[in-house]
Design a protein with these regions (language model features):
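Active-site-proximal beta-alpha loop/turn segments in soluble metabolic enzymes
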Residues: 1-14, 44-48
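Alpha-helix-loop-beta-strand connector modules within alpha/beta enzyme cores
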Residues: 18-31
């Protein structure tokens, strides 16, 4: 399907450009193989909702290592956005409660899971401190669908914001949700 802009550097073709590229190559291949042109149906994929999603994280610890880098740990990670770990997906972020200020530092955004859990390798963001809200853009396509209870972490809530309103459309999972299907054998209880 058609891609989206995850970062300001991403170049995404228009629908017409994408169709022209795919169709011209497909027609060339069919012709060179002596085949009739096939009927091609493409799904729009992430282009419908990808850019509409923004994930908000609360900043936990900010660790500044002079001469090396600054790490910003957040209250999410691999369980709510596995794409950086699985595909090397790249995202951009802003400190939401300071979005009106210019970027001030380069940081690495780390998730809360026990293994290498890096959400963003290099983010140019506003000055950041514990308790800030970090907004990560273009998370509307696959984040929720790919989220999991990895390491027994509950999934976050999903809020629909439109026309000046914010409405809860998926509630945050609770401890009860996490253990709802667990069974303790009688001899162990």
């Amino acid at each position: 399907g058609l891609g989206i802009r995850y970062t300001a550097h991403d170049e995404v073709p228009s629908v017409a450009e994408f169709a022209q590229r795919v169709c011209s190559r497909l027609l060339q291949r069919a012709d060179s193989a002596g085949l009739q042109p096939p009927r091609l149906i493409l799904e729009p994929g992430r282009s419908i909702v990808g850019e509409a999603g923004v994930t908000l994280y609360t900043v936990g610890v900010v660790k500044r290592i002079p001469g090396l880098r600054t790490y910003v740990s957040v209250d999410g990670g691999l369980s709510d956005n596995p794409r950086p770990a699985l595909y090397g997906a790249v995202y951009e972020a802003v400190v939401a409660n300071r979005a009106d200020q210019p970027p001030a530092e380069w940081v690495r955004v780390a998730g809360k899971h026990c293994e290498t859990d890096t959400l963003i390798e290099e983010a140019h963001i506003q000055s950041v401190q514990a308790g800030d809200l970090l907004a990560v853009f273009a998370t509307g396509a696959y984040n929720y669908a790919m989220s999991s209870n990895y390491n027994r972490f509950p999934r976050p809530a999903v809020v629909l914001c439109a026309d000046g309103r914010a409405e809860l459309i998926v509630r945050r999972e609770s401890l009860e949700d996490l253990v709802a299907h667990d069974i303790i054998p009688a001899h162990l209880s």
